Amino acid sequence: VTLGRVQVTDFRSLHSAILQLDPVFTLITGPNASGKTSVLESIYLLGRGRSFRTRRLDHLIRHGAERFVVFGEVDAGGRRIPVGVEGSADGIRAKIAGERPASLAELAIALPVQIIDPEIHRLIEEGPSQRRRFLDWGVFHVEQSFVSDWQRYQQVLRQRNAALKARQPRSVVSVWDADLIQYGLRLTEARSRYVELLVAAAAPIAQHLLGLSLELGYRAGWSKDRALPEALDLSWSHDQEAGATQVGPHRAELAIRLEGSPVKDRISRGQQKLLAASLLIGQVKLFPEAGVQPTLLLDDPAAELDDQRLAGLIGEVANQTVQLIVTTLHGEFAAFGNPGRRFVLEQGELQAL
């Protein structure tokens, strides 16, 4: 799967931009605040249905416009599949091959896209939900049945939480327990399998970039000394008090250790970035084994990295089987080879070179 033509209209500072992307390597250069990150953000939106920078939809619409439109043509085994996303005051609307998808997960099937940007340290620094989202996106592409189990679990969880919030008796709340347990265990098993694959892929990268041994573990979201049915039963009083379900895979955590010690608050910002990059590149590394070629967006890789660390990061990215789209202030990166397509962006105007 590769992304070919992309057309962006009224997205952030971009009034109108058209890119014909190279299937291997596209380079976008330009000064700071020229809109380079916005181009990557629009491509990310095509594959995710959301921004990696903001939850505020109105921030994505160019000042004075009523909506933005991002359109792309995906080449999937010789078939061209049009994919489009439109955002307005009414929300996000997507189309794949002219049809409205049943869920935004279908965008991820049509265009698997991941990003490494200057904010990737948030994957390490912020709370467990960031890491659950990272895990689930990876599991979905390795085990595509995962998304239906995830959606069903979320539906059951919402219904159970609504009953708890409404102070319904235990006999009413427990109606949802069997499905919560069934789908919760499926998610847990799939995530656990994926973490084993991920650490095998990411540990050598972390060793190269950080010079430290990486270990990953999966904490299921309830005590490891109990089965989920027992944990759910014992949590009843806590659930009542909180008005929400307190155990289950929605409370899971990806445990990360370097040299045997938890990483939280123990490593520098630069190390956080390289650790997060190791996980993201490790995730991308697993895609070809599942028969998928992802699009990898690399935004300003030189930001806050010294020459040695930058060379290591670029070398690891260059080893992956991806469609690569890179933004930078100027220049090229020899490890990637010559870009098949190159664009320069200045003051919101994009030109092919």
Spans of model-derived segments:
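Nucleotide-state sensing region of NTPase/ATPase domains
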Residues: Y44-Q130, D136-F146, E196-P204, L214, ...
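Long, charged N-terminal accessory/stalk domains
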Residues: R122-L123, S129-S174, A178
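Hydrophobic "anchor" residues on beta-strands that sit immediately upstream
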Residues: I18, R93, V113, T295-L296
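Conserved lysine of the Walker
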Residues: K36
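Walker B catalytic acidic pair
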Residues: D299-P301
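Conserved NTPase motor "head" modules and their coupling/switch loops across ABC/AAA+ ATPases, GTPases
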Residues: V1-P31, L45, R170-Q182, R186-T295, ...
